[in-house]
Design a protein with these regions (language model features):
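Binding/recognition "hotspot" determinant
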Residues: 1-740
Length: 740
């Protein structure tokens, strides 16, 4: 048994509070040459050690529970300060952590037997020679999780509450602690009359490992973590740039939350053989199984080897509302200086038609900026003259600008991503997977066999891909209003109002192929055999199935996005002088694309006997021209698989003023295509007893053309058409600038 020691200290000083609490597991330690624990009821071992130099025996008519104890630390702290004129600050923090203290059962020979259930949680069993765990009920062994949690919040307020800042961080993380069973040369045996469930375990033996039960389940250990960040500010901010100086006052808010899910694979490792037997089903998910010799897996009503997914989720929100003022230099002057600095890039007209049009638009824009800048610096209309003689020049009034503004913005983004925690099955010699009444399903798994692999099922054998899903979305909006002033004349000049926003979303699925690599012969026997998102390779093939389907899998995704914007400005002194701009864009795309074709390949030939063969964009055959793959079938279906990756975004804008409108256009286009040809390499066919060539059946026989990109186009246009140059006002502007 165990006890819990508690140590708690508190210091409370009103505005300063500190608390520390520590809880410690105090376990028992039992040491002897031979140890025998027996009970007519239950046996519970918590955070304790049972160590025998010879035999360790634990026997009970009731349940046997061998579980971890727990240490924990809790720290709480609060501080606050108050100053004059409404100024104050405060800080609050919490830290909490737990640590599991494993129970350990150690002996040269270890025997744990219950007439009910055996539960081993976060604890370890070590049998230096031989270990046995038996139960008439269930055997459950699982890892546990250490926890770390923290919370921290700071708040500051300035003069009369005009400025303030609050920052909150919260973090939580679980750490996987596997439960281990170690065995010596005579191996390890788990024998349950009901269910054997292993989750987050490491079972290792220099001898053989035997796992038996009605149902045998092997699972990963799932851990979660999250972090939250929240920040609220109220106050002043400023910036300096070549265009001027600005200062603003307002409120900014940021919130972000991230959730992470991790899968830690279980491990079954033997220096000899691994035997897994279930009278009902074997289910293994995200597991690593390795045997130096043979791996034998048998589930009378089915065998399932699959994966679990890690995931990442994040949601971020931002908002801001500010009142500001700025003083600066006319933007046309700043732009002209930048254009002169980048004149080499600006006049580069290489590339495709879209590139040339983009640069042409930039050049015309630079000329227009130059004209504005010239007029701003030197006004040629002085004294009514139309030329730029020295006596007629006047320093312009539009060099410096000033404005006051109100702006509000909001944005939100979210993302979800998954990654597969694959399973792996490895044997140095042979591997046998059988189901006498059911099916064999293998997904997202890497199988490697040194010698022969035998798959046998009464119903179906399916070797397929695993899925990784992702989604994303985002939106933003901005609203603004500003008043600009003429610094020289001391009056309000222009009123401007604007609004803009964006929206986007996307989702998709990526397929991660299973792989099977066999050093010797791959033999299968089933009603149906399906290879979907799988790459299977063996020295020789011996395939027997009524229906054989081999198909490649397409990654799929779609996306949609849009934007809008508009602005209106008017000269308050001369209301007939105004401008309005409206712009927007809309895009969408979809993708169906095979990353890697499904394949069934023999290095040195073999045979396939089937009633019906279906090949959809996959590759079958032999690497050896002299040792071909021989396929016997009554029916063959051959289909190529066509991929596409298409996206198009069309947008533009129009600016309306007192003269001819100015038009801009935006066009992005991606158009790609790929073909995955159903291919048969070095393969002889016999269809309904008649020899037939692969070409006659419609197969591609050139491995270099099995997967081929047939279209690859990408164009991007973002240009102003400068249609306003057709108007007299812009022509006069250029004429005036040209006369200086």
């Amino acid at each position: 048994g165990n006890l819990e020691a508690v140590d708690k200290k508190v210091r409370d000083g009103g505005k300063d509070y500190i608390s520390d609490e520590k809880r410690t597991n105090v376990g028992s330690n039992l040491n002897a040459k031979d140890i025998s624990l027996t009970s007519l009821g239950d046996i519970g071992i918590t955070g304790s050690n049972i160590v025998a130099t010879n035999k360790a025996s634990i026997q009970a008519k009731g349940d046997i529970s061998i579980v971890a104890g727990k240490d924990s630390v809790l720290h709480e702290e609060k501080h606050s300060k108050s100053k004059g004129f409404g100024r104050s600050s405060s800080e609050e923090s919490v830290a909490y952590a737990t640590r599991n203290v494993a129970s350990n059962v150690i002996g040269d020979k270890v025997n744990i037997t219950s007439e009910k259930d055996v539960n081993i949680f976060g604890s370890n069993v070590q049998a230096n020679t031989e270990g046995q765990i038996r139960a008439d009920g269930n055997i459950t062994q699982a890892g546990v999780k250490d926890i770390n949690y923290s919370y921290h919040k700071t708040t500051k307020k300035g003069f009369m509450g005009l400025t303030s800042k609050s920052v909150t961080d919260e973090n939580y993380a679980e750490k996987a602690i596997l439960s281990a069973t170690l065995g010596g040369d005579k191996g390890l045996t788990y024998d349950s009359k009901n269910n054997l469930i292993l989750s987050g375990v490491k079972v290792v033996s220099s001898g053989s490992i035997n796992l038996k039960g009605k149902n045998v389940e092997i699972n990963p250990l799932e851990t979660n973590s999250y972090n939250k960040h929240k920040e609220v500010k109220r106050g002043f901010s400023g910036s300096f740039s070549p265009k001027g100086i600005s200062v603003s006052y307002g409120k900014d808010k940021l919130e972000s939350k991230t959730d992470i899910l991790n899968q830690t694979a279980s491990q079954i490792i033997s220096n000899k053989d691994i035997n897994i037997e279930a009278t009902d089903k074997v289910k293994a998910k995200s597991v690593d199984i390795y045997a130096k010799n043979d791996v034998n897996i048998s589930g009378d009503n089915g065998v399932e080897i699959s994966t679990a997914n890690n995931s990442y989720d994040n949601t971020t929100k931002q908002s801001s509302s500010r009142i500001g003022a700025s003083v600066g230099i006319n933007s046309a002057i700043v732009n002209t200086v930048e254009n002169v600095k980048n004149i080499k890039e600006l006049t580069d007209f290489s590339g495709n038609s879209y590139d040339i049009l983009n640069n042409a638009s930039k050049v015309v824009g630079a000329i227009k900026d130059g004209a504005k800048a010239t007029i701003a610096v030197a006004d040629t209309n002085y004294k009514g003259a139309t030329d730029a003689g020295y006596d007629n020049l006047k320093i312009g009034k539009n060099i410096f600008t000033a404005s006051v503004s109100y702006n509000k913005s909001e944005s939100k983004s979210s993302v979800h991503n998954e990654t597969v925690e694959k399973s792996s099955l490895v044997s140095g010699n042979n591997m046998n997977i059988k189901s006498k009444n059911g099916s064999i399903n293998i997904s997202g798994t890497d199988v490697k066999v040194g010698n022969d692999l035998d798959l046998s099922a009464k119903k179906d054998i399916v070797i397929k891909e695993s899925e990784e899903n992702y989604t994303s979305s985002g939106s933003s909006s901005q609203t603004g209003i500003s008043l600009s002033a003429n610094l020289e004349e001391g009056r309000i000049a222009d009123l401007s109002v604007s609004q803009a926003g964006t929206r986007a979303r996307g989702n998709g699925t990526n397929y991660i192929n299973s792989t099977v690599n066999v050093g010797g012969k791959l033999k299968t026997n089933s009603e149906n055999l399906t290879l979907s998102g799988a790459n299977v390779e063996a020295d020789k093939l011996d395939i027997n199935a009524k229906n054989l389907v081999i198909e490649s899998k397409q990654d799929k995704s779609e996306r949609k996005d849009s934007s809008y914007g508009g602005s209106f400005s008017i000269d308050l002194v001369n209301p007939s002088s105004f401008s309005a701009n409206i712009n927007g864009s809309k895009g969408s795309g979809e993708k169906e694309w095979v990353n890697k074709q499904t394949s069934l390949i023999a290095r040195n030939g073999g045979k396939v006997d089937t009633d019906s063969l279906t090949n959809i964009g996959a590759v079958i055959g032999s690497e050896n021209e002299k040792e071909k793959l021989k396929v016997s079938a009554n029916k063959v279906i051959v289909k190529d698989l066509e991929d596409k990756n298409k996206y198009e975004n069309i947008g533009g804008g129009i600016t309306i003023g007192t003269d001819v409108p100015n038009v801009s256009i935006k066009h992005d286009k991606i158009d790609k295509e790929q073909i995955n040809r159903a291919s048969a390499i070095n393969t002889d066919f016999e269809i309904s007893g008649k020899k037939t060539s692969a070409e006659e059946l419609g197969f591609n026989t050139d491995i270099d053309k099995a997967q081929e990109i047939t279209k690859d186009e990408e164009k991007h246009l973002d240009a102003e058409l400068h249609t306003d140059l057709l108007g007299k006002d812009k022509q006069e502007e250029l004429k005036k600038a040209g006369g200086i």
